[in-house]
Each structure stands twice: as structure tokens, then as C-alpha cells.
Amino acid sequence: STIHTNNAAETITRILNMWVKAFLIPASVNAIIAQRLVKKLCSCKKEVNIKDIGEDIIKSVKNAINITDKQELSFRVWDKLKKPVFYKSVGCKKCDWSWYSWRTWIYEVLEITPWVKEMILSWSSAFNINRQAIKDWMISLEQDGVMKALNGLTSLEEIYRVAKSQKG
């Protein structure tokens, strides 16, 4: 089923607001996936000088990748964290000067862990459920997007254009 929310945790509060009894959610849901489509950079991309990226974006990136004890997050970008390189497109005939070609997706998977289950049963806020899910090793939309930007699939600007609505 599809429920339009900004992140996976908001799905729980949306269901609760539809007067579904709280005990039914963990009894019938194992995981919730939130996803967003992001534009992929064209092959005409070039490296961006870190100094040219806005300080607010750099701060957000540092916060997103600061949780380096996550095995999956570390495994996917560990070598790139030592000297991060981000890209932007310059435009060409192939992308019709739009800088992007096709799309890819960023996603997060919120598993209904025992801690999350307790929070659902006590009607915790989406913000607190999201925080707990991240403690329980969920990789957020923002973190997945930063990993894709570090791998040159998309730009930081695109990630923060799409993922900004899911913050706090």
C-alpha cells in the first residue's frame, strides 16, 4: 500500500491518525519503506571543489555521515569518507543541457524493532520514532542520498532538494 508521508516514521503516525488501534500496527507491519526519486547526474559531471559547496550543506553532510559505526553506511562509503568528492554536471548535448539524465531513488527502511514497537504502542511522535529507528541502524533518506552523491550518482543539491522535507 502507499501512504504519502515525508519519511517512514510518519507513516506510523498517519496510520494512528486514521484511528487504527496502535496494537494492530506492530502486529501487522514488519517494515516500512520510504522512497524518493532523485535526478541522476549526466556523464558530463565534474568534481566540485569542497569550498564551493555551501556551508549549510557541508554541515548537513557531516551530520548525516557522522554515524560511521553503522556497518552498511561505513561499508558503502568508507574509502570515500577519507577524502570526500562530490560532483555536479556541466551540461552537454546528451542531457540536453539539463545536467541530469534519468533518475534513481533514495530510500529508508524502518524495521519494526522491539523498541519501535514500544514507541508505537505509547503513541510516540514520528520524530522520536525516526530517531529510535536510526539508533536501531536505519539508514535515513538523507544518508542514502549522501552515499549516492559520494558515489557520483547525483548531486548534493538534488539530495537536499528532495530530502529536506523529511528532516525533524
Stretches found by the model and what they are:
Residues 1-168:
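Short, flexible helix-loop junctions that flank or precede catalytic/ligand sites
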